[in-house]
Protein backbone atom coordinates (compact mmCIF):
# COMPACT_ATOMS: atom_id res chain seq x y z
CA UNK A 1 0.00 0.00 0.00
CA UNK A 2 2.72 2.50 0.97
CA UNK A 3 4.64 1.66 -2.21
CA UNK A 4 1.55 2.06 -4.39
CA UNK A 5 0.25 5.30 -2.87
CA UNK A 6 3.39 7.04 -1.60
CA UNK A 7 6.16 5.33 -3.57
CA UNK A 8 7.86 4.20 -0.36
CA UNK A 9 10.49 1.47 -0.38
CA UNK A 10 10.91 -0.96 2.50
CA UNK A 11 13.70 1.18 3.97
CA UNK A 12 11.50 4.31 3.61
CA UNK A 13 8.69 2.54 5.43
CA UNK A 14 10.82 1.96 8.51
CA UNK A 15 13.05 5.04 8.30
CA UNK A 16 10.06 7.39 8.21
CA UNK A 17 7.93 5.38 10.65
CA UNK A 18 5.06 4.86 8.20
CA UNK A 19 3.74 2.08 10.44
CA UNK A 20 2.97 4.74 13.10
CA UNK A 21 1.98 7.71 10.93
CA UNK A 22 -1.24 9.00 9.43
CA UNK A 23 -1.72 9.26 5.65
CA UNK A 24 -1.27 13.05 5.77
CA UNK A 25 2.07 12.63 7.54
CA UNK A 26 3.31 10.03 5.08
CA UNK A 27 2.92 12.49 2.25
CA UNK A 28 5.59 14.81 3.70
CA UNK A 29 8.59 12.56 2.98
CA UNK A 30 10.85 12.09 -0.02
CA UNK A 31 10.19 8.44 -0.72
CA UNK A 32 11.88 6.13 -3.21
CA UNK A 33 9.60 7.17 -6.08
CA UNK A 34 9.97 10.88 -5.35
CA UNK A 35 13.72 10.40 -4.99
CA UNK A 36 13.92 9.08 -8.54
CA UNK A 37 11.71 11.86 -9.88
CA UNK A 38 14.01 14.45 -8.30
CA UNK A 39 17.04 12.65 -9.72
CA UNK A 40 15.61 12.89 -13.24
CA UNK A 41 15.09 16.64 -12.89
CA UNK A 42 18.19 17.59 -10.89
CA UNK A 43 20.82 15.33 -12.44
CA UNK A 44 22.34 15.46 -15.89
CA UNK A 45 21.66 12.07 -17.42
CA UNK A 46 25.06 11.77 -19.09
CA UNK A 47 26.87 12.28 -15.76
CA UNK A 48 24.81 10.04 -13.47
CA UNK A 49 26.82 6.95 -14.39
CA UNK A 50 29.89 8.59 -12.88
CA UNK A 51 28.26 7.96 -9.50
CA UNK A 52 27.33 4.37 -10.34
CA UNK A 53 30.66 3.13 -11.68
CA UNK A 54 33.15 2.80 -8.83
CA UNK A 55 36.20 3.32 -11.05
CA UNK A 56 34.83 6.52 -12.58
CA UNK A 57 33.71 7.73 -9.16
CA UNK A 58 37.06 6.99 -7.50
CA UNK A 59 38.97 8.76 -10.25
CA UNK A 60 36.74 11.82 -10.24
CA UNK A 61 36.82 12.21 -6.45
CA UNK A 62 40.43 11.08 -5.98
CA UNK A 63 41.30 14.13 -3.90
CA UNK A 64 38.59 13.24 -1.35
CA UNK A 65 38.54 9.45 -1.47
CA UNK A 66 40.84 8.71 1.46
CA UNK A 67 41.60 5.07 0.66
CA UNK A 68 43.81 3.04 -1.66
CA UNK A 69 42.30 0.91 -4.41
CA UNK A 70 43.30 -0.81 -7.64
CA UNK A 71 41.52 -1.87 -10.83
CA UNK A 72 41.92 -5.60 -11.50
CA UNK A 73 41.53 -5.16 -15.26
CA UNK A 74 44.03 -2.37 -15.89
CA UNK A 75 46.68 -3.24 -13.29
CA UNK A 76 49.49 -5.68 -13.98
CA UNK A 77 49.79 -8.87 -11.98
CA UNK A 78 52.83 -7.42 -10.24
CA UNK A 79 50.86 -4.32 -9.22
CA UNK A 80 48.03 -6.45 -7.87
CA UNK A 81 50.42 -8.63 -5.89
CA UNK A 82 52.09 -5.54 -4.43
CA UNK A 83 48.70 -4.17 -3.41
CA UNK A 84 47.87 -7.40 -1.58
CA UNK A 85 51.31 -7.43 0.04
CA UNK A 86 50.53 -3.98 1.43
CA UNK A 87 46.97 -4.95 2.40
CA UNK A 88 46.88 -8.68 3.27
CA UNK A 89 43.21 -8.27 4.15
CA UNK A 90 41.33 -6.43 1.42
CA UNK A 91 37.87 -5.94 -0.05
CA UNK A 92 36.73 -6.96 -3.53
CA UNK A 93 33.92 -4.93 -5.10
CA UNK A 94 32.04 -5.22 -8.36
CA UNK A 95 32.38 -1.80 -9.99
CA UNK A 96 28.63 -1.73 -10.75
CA UNK A 97 27.46 -3.42 -7.56
CA UNK A 98 25.14 -1.77 -5.06
CA UNK A 99 23.28 -2.58 -1.82
CA UNK A 100 26.32 -4.52 -0.68
CA UNK A 101 26.04 -7.07 -3.48
CA UNK A 102 29.37 -8.20 -4.90
CA UNK A 103 31.37 -7.10 -1.84
CA UNK A 104 33.75 -9.66 -0.35
CA UNK A 105 36.29 -9.42 2.44
CA UNK A 106 39.35 -11.48 1.55
CA UNK A 107 42.13 -12.66 3.86
CA UNK A 108 45.06 -13.38 1.57
CA UNK A 109 46.55 -15.86 4.06
CA UNK A 110 43.55 -18.13 3.44
CA UNK A 111 43.74 -18.30 -0.37
CA UNK A 112 46.10 -18.91 -3.25
CA UNK A 113 46.60 -15.27 -4.22
CA UNK A 114 47.80 -15.89 -7.78
CA UNK A 115 44.92 -18.24 -8.58
CA UNK A 116 42.39 -15.90 -7.02
CA UNK A 117 43.62 -12.93 -9.04
CA UNK A 118 43.63 -14.94 -12.27
CA UNK A 119 40.01 -15.94 -11.68
CA UNK A 120 38.99 -12.33 -11.00
CA UNK A 121 40.64 -10.97 -14.12
CA UNK A 122 39.31 -13.74 -16.37
CA UNK A 123 35.66 -13.05 -15.58
CA UNK A 124 34.11 -11.48 -18.66
CA UNK A 125 30.74 -10.74 -17.06
CA UNK A 126 32.13 -8.76 -14.11
CA UNK A 127 34.75 -6.13 -13.34
CA UNK A 128 36.26 -5.74 -9.89
CA UNK A 129 38.37 -3.38 -7.86
CA UNK A 130 40.36 -4.15 -4.72
CA UNK A 131 40.20 -1.75 -1.78
CA UNK A 132 42.21 -1.36 1.37
CA UNK A 133 40.31 -2.04 4.62
CA UNK A 134 39.44 1.07 6.60
CA UNK A 135 39.54 1.45 10.36
CA UNK A 136 36.82 3.83 11.45
CA UNK A 137 36.64 6.01 14.52
CA UNK A 138 36.18 3.88 17.63
CA UNK A 139 32.92 5.43 18.82
CA UNK A 140 31.17 4.37 15.60
CA UNK A 141 33.11 1.15 15.06
CA UNK A 142 31.96 -0.10 18.46
CA UNK A 143 28.35 -0.30 17.26
CA UNK A 144 29.30 -3.28 15.06
CA UNK A 145 33.06 -3.96 14.71
CA UNK A 146 32.57 -6.58 11.99
CA UNK A 147 31.63 -4.01 9.34
CA UNK A 148 32.22 -0.39 8.45
CA UNK A 149 29.22 1.60 9.68
CA UNK A 150 28.59 4.38 7.20
CA UNK A 151 26.82 7.72 7.37
CA UNK A 152 24.46 8.45 4.48
CA UNK A 153 23.86 12.15 3.79
CA UNK A 154 21.56 13.22 0.96
CA UNK A 155 22.31 16.61 -0.56
CA UNK A 156 20.71 18.85 -3.18
CA UNK A 157 23.05 21.35 -4.80
CA UNK A 158 21.61 24.72 -5.81
CA UNK A 159 23.93 25.42 -8.74
CA UNK A 160 22.49 28.88 -9.39
CA UNK A 161 23.30 30.15 -5.90
CA UNK A 162 26.13 27.66 -5.26
CA UNK A 163 24.48 26.46 -2.06
CA UNK A 164 24.41 22.88 -0.75
CA UNK A 165 21.12 21.87 0.89
CA UNK A 166 21.16 18.86 3.21
CA UNK A 167 17.97 16.86 2.76
CA UNK A 168 18.35 14.04 5.29
CA UNK A 169 20.90 11.83 7.00
CA UNK A 170 21.05 8.44 8.63
CA UNK A 171 23.62 6.09 10.06
CA UNK A 172 23.82 2.57 8.67
CA UNK A 173 25.03 -0.04 11.13
CA UNK A 174 25.96 -3.63 10.37
CA UNK A 175 24.34 -6.57 12.14
CA UNK A 176 24.78 -10.31 12.65
CA UNK A 177 28.55 -9.94 12.15
CA UNK A 178 28.10 -9.37 8.40
CA UNK A 179 30.88 -7.35 6.75
CA UNK A 180 28.48 -4.86 5.11
CA UNK A 181 25.97 -2.49 6.71
CA UNK A 182 23.24 -2.55 4.04
CA UNK A 183 19.57 -3.16 4.86
CA UNK A 184 19.54 -6.08 2.46
CA UNK A 185 22.10 -7.80 4.69
CA UNK A 186 20.10 -7.23 7.89
CA UNK A 187 21.70 -3.86 8.58
CA UNK A 188 20.20 -1.33 10.98
CA UNK A 189 19.41 2.29 10.13
CA UNK A 190 18.75 5.30 12.35
CA UNK A 191 17.91 8.89 11.49
CA UNK A 192 20.33 11.74 12.18
CA UNK A 193 19.34 15.34 12.87
CA UNK A 194 20.97 17.41 10.12
CA UNK A 195 21.69 20.39 12.37
CA UNK A 196 23.12 18.63 15.42
CA UNK A 197 24.38 15.27 14.17
CA UNK A 198 22.48 13.49 16.94
CA UNK A 199 20.62 10.23 16.22
CA UNK A 200 16.95 11.06 16.76
CA UNK A 201 15.23 7.74 16.08
CA UNK A 202 15.37 4.19 17.27
CA UNK A 203 17.36 1.84 15.09
CA UNK A 204 15.22 0.01 12.53
CA UNK A 205 15.57 -2.79 10.03
CA UNK A 206 13.55 -4.35 7.22
CA UNK A 207 12.00 -6.94 9.55
CA UNK A 208 9.86 -4.36 11.37
CA UNK A 209 12.16 -4.47 14.39
CA UNK A 210 13.33 -1.40 16.28
CA UNK A 211 16.32 -1.05 18.56
CA UNK A 212 17.29 1.30 21.38
CA UNK A 213 20.62 -0.51 21.55
CA UNK A 214 22.47 -2.71 19.07
CA UNK A 215 21.32 -6.34 19.44
CA UNK A 216 24.88 -7.71 19.59
CA UNK A 217 27.06 -5.03 21.18
CA UNK A 218 24.27 -3.37 23.21
CA UNK A 219 25.65 0.08 22.40
CA UNK A 220 22.88 2.68 22.62
CA UNK A 221 21.75 4.03 19.24
CA UNK A 222 19.16 6.68 20.15
CA UNK A 223 20.79 9.94 21.22
CA UNK A 224 24.28 9.11 19.95
CA UNK A 225 26.26 12.14 18.77
CA UNK A 226 27.95 11.56 15.42
CA UNK A 227 31.55 12.75 15.84
CA UNK A 228 33.02 15.37 13.51
CA UNK A 229 29.54 16.27 12.28
CA UNK A 230 30.36 19.77 11.04
CA UNK A 231 33.37 18.32 9.22
CA UNK A 232 31.12 15.72 7.59
CA UNK A 233 28.88 18.44 6.19
CA UNK A 234 31.82 20.53 5.02
CA UNK A 235 33.21 17.47 3.27
CA UNK A 236 29.91 16.98 1.41
CA UNK A 237 29.84 20.64 0.39
CA UNK A 238 33.27 20.24 -1.19
CA UNK A 239 32.25 17.03 -2.97
CA UNK A 240 29.07 18.58 -4.38
CA UNK A 241 31.05 21.32 -6.07
CA UNK A 242 33.24 18.77 -7.83
CA UNK A 243 30.20 17.44 -9.69
CA UNK A 244 27.73 20.31 -10.06
CA UNK A 245 25.80 18.63 -12.90
CA UNK A 246 24.63 15.83 -10.57
CA UNK A 247 22.88 17.90 -7.95
CA UNK A 248 20.92 15.29 -5.96
CA UNK A 249 23.18 12.64 -4.43
CA UNK A 250 23.22 10.29 -1.46
CA UNK A 251 26.78 10.23 -0.10
CA UNK A 252 28.19 7.43 2.07
CA UNK A 253 30.84 8.61 4.52
CA UNK A 254 33.27 6.78 6.78
CA UNK A 255 34.91 8.68 9.63
CA UNK A 256 38.32 7.09 9.95
CA UNK A 257 40.25 6.38 13.12
CA UNK A 258 42.30 9.57 12.74
CA UNK A 259 39.13 11.65 12.38
CA UNK A 260 39.41 12.27 8.64
Go through the PLM ranges and name each one.
Residues 58-61, 84-105, 125-141:
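ATP-grasp fold ATP-binding core
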Residues 113-203:
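Phosphate-binding site of ATP-dependent enzymes
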